[in-house]
Amino acid sequence: MSNTAEFPLLSLIMFTPLVGAVLLLFVSKHSENTIRWIANGFAVLGFLVSLPLWFWLDQSTSDWQFVERLSWIPSIGAEYFIGVDGFSALLILLATLMGSIAILSSWTAITERVKEYYIFLLLLQTGMIGAFVSLDFLLFFVFWEVMLVPMYFLIGIWGSTNRLYSAIKFFLFTLVGSVIMLLGILAVYFYHHEVTGVYTFDITRFHELNMPFDLQWWVFLAFFLGFAVKVPMFPFHTWLPDAHTDAPTAGSVILAAVLLKMGTYGFIRFSLPILPEATQAFVPWVVWLSIIGIIYGALVAMAQRDWKRLVAYSSVSHMGMVMLGMFALTPVGITGSIVQQINHGISTGGLFLLVGVVYERRHTREISEYGGLSKIMPAYAAVFLVMTMSSIGLPTLNGFIGEILILQGIFVVNKVWAAFAATGIVLGAAYMLWLYQRTMFGTVNNPKNEGLADLSLREFATFTPLLILAVWIGLYPKPFIDRLDTSVDRVMARVNSTYAPLNAGAADEDEAEPGGGDLLAQIDGETTGDGFDRLVRLPVRGGSR
């Protein structure tokens, strides 16, 4: 079911950055300040027009909302079909916010080919939003591929020393995964025609398919390779540290905060609901790869001497935690996985911004080059402290909420898996606290650091929304979780045929398994006895309990 929009809000959100990019084509490349003002103006406008998604989203319905539908390529059944639920709405808000912050952070950092730089950033913004709103699989794939081009040029032109190598590596890894994913899309497309006689790329119809297990298995593998590269999961992660290290600050921020979420979004939106039986069969494999990623990413991060590379490997570890929660296949685990995606975008995006601040001043990312910065840049040190604590999951900050939900979701499925996940959290705290101690505390041994300027008003403005969100989600996550309930219910109804949300109206409590409605209230009220067990314990193949 879907609610058709009377006003094309999603198209407005999606194409606002594109309008800005087109407008920049007509501005002289020598008018650099004009270019910066236009790019920042359209980025902020894109965020402002996306805010109605927060206020107008109907949390009581599982229908797709703000739907727009037009015929696109009727000969093959492709449509301009877009819409959102709570999950995609939150990711759109994250994309528009982080895009605005990334563009603002580039004001003084980019001095060459300024016009092209901002055009690529705005095109990237349109591609990200388009992927999150697409309900037509071919349309989704088009936007998925569109994102590759601007990011390739952002790394290859405005990156650091090994930018060409990193850009090509990023492009090839993602392209290979995309081609394999396309084969899976076509398999679902032709199977749908075989059983219904209708050619369509309609994702909502694909969610209703009951494909044979053998076909599900192969399609899941194709989707897995496409999405796992994007997450990235171990062992498909090797492009990420290079891309992060050599990308300009804005590129790293968008890559960490939004682009990595394309992979996890794909799993939740496509793999789990379209291929439920194959999903359950692959659970042990995905979980163990996630656990390896959590531990491996943390251990390698501890060995880094490059500030940016350390944060890059922390992303491998954190996204492994996201995948672990997702493939617990429990309402709490999936909810925690989505919340942690938002949290990772906030904290890791903030950390890359912080690296960019000192790199712009010193043009080095070597951790050994710094020390005692809290004495010279107290405001910077304070912001870095909050982002560090957010990243390691300190209670009262956003990272804690996602991690505790994931651990709750995975614990009753398999306690060994939960123990490995907890180990990753401890290691994460170790390398982040080590980084903070090495860079912020001690004496200022390097004379080049003595004259470093603290955060400017513009720089502090880029961190302000991230600080607010880190505290808001940490203290009161309910508004975010409430917006996810129906999205999680839709996925759970497919991966578990016996699942029923609380708001399904079951006559007897034992007839319904909690998971819908107010998830936090359920956890508060059912953390003992059979209540909590019903909330998180769901049948999953291949996992011991």
Where are these regions (language model features)?
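Predominantly late transmembrane helices and immediately cytosolic-facing juxtamembrane segments
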Residues: F234, T348-F352, A418-G451
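Alpha-helical multi-pass transmembrane bundles of energy-transducing inner-membrane proteins
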Residues: H30-E32, E116-L123, M128-L215, V300-Y313, ...
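Juxtamembrane/interfacial segments at transmembrane-helix boundaries in multi-pass membrane proteins
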Residues: L57-E79, V179-H237, D242, F267-W285, ...
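Central hydrophobic cores of alpha-helical transmembrane segments in multi-pass inner-membrane proteins
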Residues: S11-F26, N40-L53, L94-S106, L124-T126, ...
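C-terminal ends of transmembrane helices
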Residues: A21-E32, G99-T111, F153-N162, V231-T245, ...
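Helix-coil boundary and interhelical linker segments in multi-pass alpha-helical membrane proteins
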Residues: M1-T4, I129-L135, I268-F282, V322-I342, ...
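Cytoplasmic/organellar membrane-interface segments at the starts of transmembrane helices
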Residues: M377-Y380, M432-R545
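Transmembrane helix-loop-helix hairpins at membrane boundaries of multipass inner-membrane proteins
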Residues: M1-L9, L23-I119, E194-N210, D510-V540
